[in-house]
Design a protein with these regions (language model features):
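Short N-terminal binding/cap micro-motifs at the start of the first secondary-structure element
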Residues: 49-52, 77-79
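Short polar catalytic/cofactor-binding loops
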Residues: 46-48, 73
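Catalytic cores of large soluble enzymes that bind and process phosphate-bearing ligands
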Residues: 9-16, 48, 93-97, 153
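ATP-dependent carboxylate-amine ligase catalytic core
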Residues: 31-36, 58-141, 145-162
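Short, basic phosphate-binding NTP loop
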Residues: 1-44, 51-55, 61-63
Length: 162
């Protein structure tokens, strides 16, 4: 006969299994979407990322790519090849975080774009790794510069930042 404690344990195991299943399914869907974007460029560095993101986006747009660009910061913007208008990045209630890249990739695929120029929004080195290896999987990476800034997160020396 099941005791209340046994039932609670089974319920917890089922919930964990469901969360794990949903996470694996979402990761597979995201990877499938990424594979539909042949050119993915990740812009990283301390200063000037938005400017370089816009420049590379404009070059690709001029070269007839169906390119979408995304800048970050306090005025994060989406740039689309088919219009001059820039659109604000619509954020979920939890605010800006690297997880929003899943939604960006979904938009890029929905628009049938063949290129994404994405400014890295992560400062923490661990998040930068997740941003690149799991969320964007860029086939071109651009490091704009390395400067002594964000040293509380990136490290005490320029070498650590690099």
């Amino acid at each position: 006969m099941f005791k209340e404690r046994d039932f609670s344990l089974i319920l917890i195991i089922i919930c964990i299994a469901l969360i794990l299943f949903l996470g694996i399914r979402e990761k597979k869907r995201h990877t499938h979407r990424l594979n539909k974007i042949p050119l993915r460029i990740n812009i990283n560095g301390i200063r000037g990322k938005s400017t370089i993101t816009r420049m590379i986006y404009s070059i690709l747009r001029e070269d007839q790519y169906h390119v979408i660009g995304k800048t970050t910061g306090t005025d994060a913007r989406m740039l689309y090849w088919f219009t001059e208008k820039e659109y604000p990045v619509l954020r979920k209630p939890q605010g800006a975080n690297i997880g929003e890249q899943r939604d960006i990739v979904q938009k890029v695929v929905k628009q049938k774009a063949n290129a994404l120029v994405n400014e890295c929004m992560a400062v923490n080195p661990d998040y930068q790794i997740v941003f690149q290896e799991d969320l964007v999987k860029a086939n071109i990476g651009v490091i704009v510069n390395v400067m002594e800034d964000h040293m509380d997160v990136l490290g005490p020396t320029l070498q650590d930042i690099a």
